[in-house]
Amino acid sequence: MKISEWPAEERPREKLMQRGVGSLSDAELLAVFLGSGVRGRNVVELARGLLVKFGGLRQLLEADRDAFVGELGLGPVRYGQLQALLEIGRRNLATSIERDCALESPSAVRRYLKAMLRHEPSEVFGCLFLDSKHRPLAFEILFRGTIDRASIYPREVVRRSLMHNAAALILCHNHPSGNSEPSQDDVHMTLALKRGLALIDVRVLDHIIVGDGEPLSMVEQGWIVA
């Protein structure tokens, strides 16, 4: 059955407008984004099939380009639109955090950094810069590629800390493999950055590693001391 033949209150767009976006299921949200179905499948049926194929909404959103565009009903244009929407969400989150100083607990910090890093297909290294009261000043991704001691330049972290007039910071990087356990390079690199930043009186409060599941705190796990 075509969506146009459904009762108005059950059509995803109308339902969104009448009841709010929170009333929509994952399939209905995806249907609103897709806009139209394909031959033989209305847009909600298409959305449900895609969620089953990818294993859920999160897996669909994190799918690589080749897997995404290869599916019937998707393609490069929709992939580009989706990436733009995701980036809008991340930037809005970053701006809201910096404006409202909303990182009030270690768990809030981990959730924020996971939102900023988990979509990255390769390793990235970033810093959450904080003031003297540990309120967020800015978040930046500073390095991309294989993250080890050779690829991280302490002087760049120092330079960005001075630029933001930061009193402290939280280091972070992702493990695209999904395993958030730190490597020896992760530990040595963190200690080297702590030493370098101590010279300008900037404290490293933690190093968060984002993989699958809950992000890992190197301080809470005893790998480093704040």
From Swiss-Prot:
An MF annotation (GO) of this entry: metal ion binding
GO terms for biological process, alphabetical: proteolysis
Organism domain of life: Bacteria
Coiled coil regions, renumbered to chain: none
Pfam families per the UniProt record, alphabetical: RadC, UPF0758_N
Gene3D superfamilies the UniProt entry points to: Cytidine Deaminase, domain 2 (3.40.140.10)
Location of the motif JAMM motif: 173-186
SUPFAM superfamilies in alphabetical order: JAB1/MPN domain, RuvA domain 2-like
MPN domain mapped to chain residues: 102-224
Binding site for Zn(2+): H173, H175, D186
KW Hydrolase (keyword) present: yes
Keywords from the named record: Hydrolase, Metal-binding, Metalloprotease, Protease, Zinc
Family: Belongs to the UPF0758 family.
Cross-referenced PANTHER family: DNA REPAIR PROTEIN RADC, UPF0758 PROTEIN YEES-RELATED
Full protein name: UPF0758 protein PputW619_0186
